Curated annotation (Swiss-Prot):
Coiled-coil region(s): none
Gene (UniProt): ymcE
Name the record gives this protein: Uncharacterized protein YmcE
Induction profile: Transiently induced by cold shock in a PNPase-dependent fashion.
Membrane topology qualifier: Single-pass membrane protein
Transmembrane segments: 18-38
Species for this entry: Escherichia coli (strain K12)
Amino acid sequence: MRRWISQNNIRLPRGAFFISALFFFNAVCIVSDNLLIIESFGEMAYNISYLTRVPGTNTLLACCCLLRPEEVNSEY
């Protein structure tokens, strides 16, 4: 079972944006505590500042900051 981590103190980095209702559990793979690979978005990696479930649904609400490609490659 996947664990979804949400932080109480939300710090929004510059350039952060909100994504909601499109992240289905079967399309999201957590590879570290604060990094997601969104398969439905062509495996683009996001640094997650805030992540929580949307009550009563199978979706997530996340505040994301898109990582640069060189940052993504360094994780592998």
